[in-house]
Structure formats: structure tokens, C-alpha cells
């Protein structure tokens, strides 16, 4: 929840559930599998009406055993509804926006590549669009630890030192 994307997502979900007469209960496991199981048990004991699940540890069988409707975010479970972001289109849109603003020498900051996140395809689309339009683009990867600590300054300082003529991030 501490990552800005998920904070915004929780805020939007809370607004919508309130509008529909429900309360929102939020639990966070910080990518700890055991903590995630305990969080799900808390939800089960509180007899929630449904679960919006944005993680990758638990199995479809575990979610079904909770006996409440579940929807997942970017996580395919056979038989469960899933909400997908269009990361390819997002990458193209971001590149086109910056190119439309006049950027010619860009840097893309991505997540750690070996984690195989959905954001990887967004980065690939961004780079492809830059190449297609003849715009220079360097890719820098933030480590998984940077993502969770939200500590990007060393990487940002390095990017500015190595790319003094950069005009878009």
C-alpha cells in the first residue's frame, strides 16, 4: 500500500465501495507469504463480502476455500475474474506523450528485470515506440529493494550524472 500506485488504487476502491454502501477493509502482507495467509484469515473471520486480491502467493484453491467472491489484479487464476492493465498500450502512450512534448533523449526507469513483472512489457513497448520514432532511450532498472523502500535517489542521481543531455524520463 505504501507504493503510490497501490495507494491510489485503494483510495479509488474505497470511494466506490462507500458509494455502494459497503465498507472497505485493507490488509497488506508486504510480500510475506505467511503474513498474507494470516491477512486472509482475518478477512475470513470478519465475514467479508468479497476480496480484491493483488498478490501472487496464494493459490486459486486457497481463495476458493474462503467462500467469498474474489477478483484478482494482473494474476490469472482459472475460473476467477481478473482485472488486467494494458501495459503494452501504457508503454506506447507514455512514449508518444513524451515524444509529443518534444523529447529526443529519454530514460526509462523500470523495475528489476528478473522479477518478470507485468511492467516489463510496458517498458518494452516504451522502448519500441522510441525506436520506431527515432528517439534515443536508455533503460535503467530499479532494484526490488528500491521499489519497496521507495529509495530511488541514488539511481536518479546516477541517471542525471550519466545523461546530462536527457530531456525526458
Q: Which stretches of residues belong to each language-model region?
A:
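Bacterial carbohydrate/catabolite-sensing allosteric modules
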Residues: 12-22, 38, 44, 65-72, ...
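N-terminal winged-helix
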Residues: 1-15
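Phosphate- and divalent-cation-binding pockets in alpha/beta enzyme and binding domains
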Residues: 5-8, 35, 61-62, 125
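Short amphipathic alpha-helical surface micro-motifs
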Residues: 7, 51-54, 152
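Glycine-/small-residue-rich active-site loops that bind phosphorylated ligands and cofactors
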Residues: 1-2, 31-32, 58, 114-115, ...
Amino acid at each position: 500500500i505504501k507504493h503510490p500506485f497501490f495507494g491510489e488504487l485503494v483510495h479509488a476502491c474505497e470511494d466506490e465501495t462507500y458509494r455502494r454502501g459497503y465498507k472497505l477493509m485493507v490488509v497488506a502482507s508486504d510480500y510475506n507469504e505467511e503474513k498474507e495467509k494470516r491477512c486472509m484469515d482475518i478477512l475470513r473471520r470478519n465475514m467479508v463480502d468479497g476480496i480484491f486480491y493483488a498478490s501472487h502467493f496464494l493459490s486459486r484453491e486457497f481463495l476458493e476455500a474462503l467462500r467469498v467472491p474474489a477478483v484478482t489484479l494482473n494474476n490469472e487464476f482459472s475460473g476467477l475474474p481478473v482485472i488486467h492493465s494494458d501495459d503494452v498500450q501504457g508503454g506506447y502512450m507514455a512514449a508518444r506523450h513524451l515524444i509529443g512534448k518534444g523529447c529526443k533523449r529519454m530514460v526509462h526507469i523500470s523495475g528489476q528485470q528478473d522479477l518478470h513483472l507485468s511492467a516489463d512489457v510496458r517498458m518494452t513497448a516504451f522502448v519500441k515506440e522510441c525506436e520506431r520514432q527515432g528517439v534515443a532511450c536508455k533503460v535503467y532498472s530499479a532494484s526490488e529493494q528500491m521499489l519497496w523502500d521507495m529509495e530511488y535517489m541514488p539511481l536518479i542521481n546516477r541517471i542525471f550524472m550519466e545523461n546530462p543531455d536527457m530531456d525526458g524520463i
